[in-house]
């Protein structure tokens, strides 16, 4: 009987030690995740009244012991985005905090339980919303009203200058902004077709469908007319989305950008942007804003439209793992430092605008 007991004991010891190793590794991984997803700033939920409803926001402030801070107000890009952009903003907020700046963002209407529907908004509606948030922030004793600026990505390019025309801002950070809605839509369409290796025939057919959509928009066609024109195939379009595009498809930032003259502007562009024609964006920004000498342009060759590393974004698995275990590493090399350096630089309180001239698929 004795010799038979030893193998069972050895097997039990192996199982126990295997379990211990698994638990140690799991604990270590959990520790890494918690550490990497902890940020050197304080966060609080805030409520901002605007237009008879409430904006549900997040205010992130530095842990530097100062009583007052400058503020970066966030203007989202396209889509149903919550205040933290599913925590994707937090590494950028941390960079702002290192420069002594707080960050303010809010859930889009209809997102995360917020009242309203973001698809009902025009770019002017979005600008009014941001201006109201700035007014709310200026009334707070912990915010330096002379150091409030804007940060906006993609679709926000049509909103940022409208905000600056409504209320004074000290600076603007524009990330992958477009200039003209229709040009941007056509650029994106062709870029995606090239990326897919589309044939000439497929490309011609896609352009023809896009041209049909443009004609329908120009005629103020209803969603039902759009669906009929496509032979009954909505191709993912919804009535609400069609209404949103109908409100905004004529957007063009060229004239509005004049409101940013004399304001420090950081234009951030990606080398692998298939959503926005960055060459067109840079050309227009330089043409309109170089006169005041306050424009800074930063290029990130390895970045995508979202300023993430292309090598990571092209893989869903890499994106997920990096977001969990090293979220700051998602961004293109130098991007977070570049944001911080801009805020650390000369952003004079006197360089404030206000009162200036005030993915679409088409």
Residue ranges and their predicted role:
Residues 32-67:
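N-terminal cap/lid segment of alpha/beta-hydrolase-fold proteins
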Residues 276-287:
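Short alpha-helix in the alpha/beta-hydrolase fold that links the catalytic acid
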Residues 260, 267-269:
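Short beta-strand/loop motif that positions the catalytic acidic residue
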Residues 67-77:
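Short beta-strand element of the alpha/beta-hydrolase
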Residues 173-259:
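Accessory cap/linker subdomain of secreted extracellular hydrolases
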Residues 93-113:
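Conserved alpha/beta-hydrolase
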Residues 82-92, 108, 279:
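The serine-hydrolase catalytic nucleophile loop
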Residues 120-141:
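Alpha/beta-hydrolase active-site loop
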């Amino acid at each position: 009987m004795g010799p038979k007991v030893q193998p069972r004991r050895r097997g039990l010891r192996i199982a126990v030690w295997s379990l211990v190793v698994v638990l140690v590794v799991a604990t270590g991984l959990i520790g890494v995740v918690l550490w990497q997803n902890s940020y050197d700033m304080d966060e609080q939920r805030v409520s901002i009244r605007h237009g008879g409803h409430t904006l549900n926001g997040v205010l992130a402030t530095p842990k530097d012991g100062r009583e007052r801070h400058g503020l970066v107000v966030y203007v989202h890009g396209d889509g149903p985005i919550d205040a933290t952009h599913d925590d994707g903003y937090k590494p950028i907020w941390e960079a702002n905090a290192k420069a002594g700046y707080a960050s303010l963002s809010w859930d889009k209407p209809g997102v995360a339980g917020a009242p309203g529907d973001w698809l009902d908004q025009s770019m002017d509606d979005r600008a009014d919303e941001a201006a109201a948030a700035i007014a709310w922030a200026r009334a707070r004793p912990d915010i330096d009203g002379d150091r409030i600026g804007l940060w906006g990505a993609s679709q926000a390019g049509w909103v940022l200058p409208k905000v600056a025309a409504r209320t004074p801002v000290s600076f603007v950070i524009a990330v992958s902004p477009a200039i003209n809605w229709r040009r941007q839509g056509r650029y994106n369409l062709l870029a995606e077709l090239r990326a897919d290796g589309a044939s000439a025939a497929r490309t011609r057919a896609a352009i023809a469908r896009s041209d049909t959509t443009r004609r329908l928009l120009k005629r103020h066609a209803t969603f039902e007319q759009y669906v009929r024109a496509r032979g009954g195939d909505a191709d993912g379009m919804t009535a609400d989305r069609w209404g949103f595009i109908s409100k905004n498809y004529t957007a063009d930032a060229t004239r509005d950008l004049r409101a940013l003259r004399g304001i420090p502007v950081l234009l951030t562009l990606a080398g692998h942007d298939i959503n926005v024609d960055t060459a067109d964006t840079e050309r227009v920004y330089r043409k309109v804003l170089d006169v005041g000498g306050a424009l800074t342009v930063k290029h990130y060759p390895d970045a995508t439209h979202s300023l993430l590393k292309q090598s990571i974004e092209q893989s869903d698995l890499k994106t997920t793992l990096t977001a969990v275990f090293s979220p700051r590493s998602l961004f293109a090399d130098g991007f977070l430092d570049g944001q911080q350096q801009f805020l650390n630089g000369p952003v004079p309180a006197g360089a404030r605008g206000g009162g200036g001239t005030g993915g679409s698929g088409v």
